[in-house]
């Protein structure tokens, strides 16, 4: 049982790191600069994973990378922000003099989607409603079911 837990923890950590790489590329593609992975300086920075700027506005981003489908095969439609996300985001905004945002990266076996928005537009929700992102009711769609070209078996929750 312990080996299964270690393997699952490694899978989730790797999926998170993959998500951060996809997030950085998405930010570059959209003209953001001064992109910095905050986890490089101090592991598990509260709330934010990335910091960047565009048009003089500094933002911090919590990246949530998840499997598109849950183990039972249903759509994983809500990505939890974590405990006390708004309190941590507020502290991080003050620390970095930036505005808090989120990025949800949804990985399927052969495709990925990226959704992006400000924390304030979640209106206190404790999770990112990816189903509402897909319907264009919240956030922005940066990529939708775009093909990726890597073996996803390791990252799959099946």
PLM region descriptions:
Residues 20, 49, 62:
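Acidic active-site catalytic centers that drive phospho-/nucleotidyl reactions
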Residues 42-44, 67-68:
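Short, catalytically relevant binding-site loops at active-site mouths
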Residues 6-11, 30, 37, 57, ...:
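Catalytic cores of nucleic-acid endonucleases
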Residues 105-158:
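Non-catalytic C-terminal interaction segments of nucleic acid-processing enzymes
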Residues 1-39:
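Acidic-basic catalytic patches of nuclease active cores, encompassing PD-(D/E)XK
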Residues 20, 43-46, 85:
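Amphipathic coiled-coil/heptad-repeat helices and related helical stalk/stem segments
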Residues 44-53, 58:
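Short acidic loop-to-beta-strand element that houses the catalytic metal-binding Asp/Glu
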């Amino acid at each position: 049982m312990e080996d299964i837990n270690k393997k699952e923890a490694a899978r989730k950590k790797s999926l998170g790191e993959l998500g951060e790489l996809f997030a950085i590329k998405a930010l570059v593609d959209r003209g953001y600069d001064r992109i910095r992975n905050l986890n490089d300086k101090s592991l598990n920075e509260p709330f934010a994973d990335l910091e960047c700027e565009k048009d003089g506005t500094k933002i911090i981003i919590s990246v949530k990378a998840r499997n598109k489908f849950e183990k039972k095969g249903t759509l994983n439609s809500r990505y939890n922000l974590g405990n006390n996300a708004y309190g941590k985001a507020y502290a991080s905004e003050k620390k970095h003099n930036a505005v808090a945002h989120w990025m949800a990266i949804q990985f399927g076996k052969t495709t990925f989607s990226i959704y992006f928005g400000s924390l304030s537009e979640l209106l206190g929700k404790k999770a990112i409603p990816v189903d509402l992102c897909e319907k264009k009711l919240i956030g922005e769609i940066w990529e939708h079911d775009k093909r990726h070209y890597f073996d996803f078996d390791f990252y799959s929750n099946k």
